[in-house]
């Protein structure tokens, strides 16, 4: 692959043979069925990418590593913004409701979580009580007031909406950045740390 996979990207091509020897049967079955894996934030050796395998149930998640040479297909969250589903679940209603706001917000956005997984793969992952997980590519600062305005829009949705701001230094939850705390949790492949500015994370907790 020319481009390095990013967190939340979906990758096809991993086989059960790449799983740890003690991998549960559900993980073997998931890969054998042709399901994609999702890129996670973790350090990996050269030639590998840290991924997560999904099972049918929420508690079925397995951390693993995929060979970069095995990647047959990659789908990013932003490639799923306009994808529809025949299943008229609350989470899809929320996505349709918020699309105009997100399209006009000025940043690149994408769909992740169970919704992104099902829209990209066709494998059932959404249910009646699913949250809508989104990402926003924010290479430059989004002000806290801008974050609060987005949260206000999301509060009108029919289901819970969780959005992660993707900064050059890691990810921070939109709701946290829209809050009043002086420092927020920034997550990247190396660590999770408290910072006052996710776009200039010089102040970190020990």
From Swiss-Prot:
Reaction equation(s) it catalyzes: apo-[malonate decarboxylase ACP] + 2'-(5''-triphospho-alpha-D-ribosyl)-3'-dephospho-CoA = holo-[malonate decarboxylase ACP] + diphosphate
EC number in record: 2.7.7.66
One Pfam family linked to the record: MdcG
Enzyme class: transferase
GO MF, one example: nucleotidyltransferase activity
Keywords: Nucleotidyltransferase, Transferase
Statement: the UniProt record of this protein carries the keyword Transferase: yes
Similarity comment: Belongs to the MdcG family.
Claim: Coiled coil is one of the keywords in the record: no
InterPro entries the record matches: Holo-ACP_synthase (IPR017557), MdcG_C (IPR049180), MdcG_N (IPR048903)
Residues at the catalytic site: 131, 133
Record's function text: Transfers 2'-(5-triphosphoribosyl)-3'-dephosphocoenzyme-A to the apo-[acyl-carrier-protein] of the malonate decarboxylase to yield holo-[acyl-carrier-protein].
Name the UniProt record assigns to this protein: Phosphoribosyl-dephospho-CoA transferase
């Amino acid at each position: 692959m020319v481009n390095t996979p990013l967190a939340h990207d979906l990758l096809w091509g991993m086989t059960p043979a790449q799983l740890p020897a003690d991998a549960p049967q559900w993980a073997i079955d998931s890969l054998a069925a042709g399901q994609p894996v999702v890129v996670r934030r973790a350090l990996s050796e050269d030639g590998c990418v840290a991924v997560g395998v999904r099972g049918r149930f929420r508690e079925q998640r397995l951390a693993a590593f995929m060979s970069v040479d095995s990647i047959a297909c990659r789908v990013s969250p932003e490639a799923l913004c306009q994808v529809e589903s025949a299943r008229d679940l609350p989470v899809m209603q929320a996505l349709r409701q918020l699309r105009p706001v997100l399209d006009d917000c000025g940043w690149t956005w994408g769909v992740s979580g169970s919704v992104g997984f099902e829209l990209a793969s066709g494998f059932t992952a959404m249910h009646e009580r699913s949250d809508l997980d989104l990402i926003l590519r924010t290479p430059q600062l989004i002000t806290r007031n801008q974050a609060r305005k987005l949260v206000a829009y999301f509060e009108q949705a029919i289901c819970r909406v969780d959005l992660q701001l993707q900064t050059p230094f890691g990810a921070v939850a939109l709701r946290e950045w829209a809050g009043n705390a002086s420092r927020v949790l920034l997550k990247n492949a190396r660590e999770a740390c408290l910072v006052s500015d996710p776009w200039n994370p010089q102040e970190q907790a020990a």
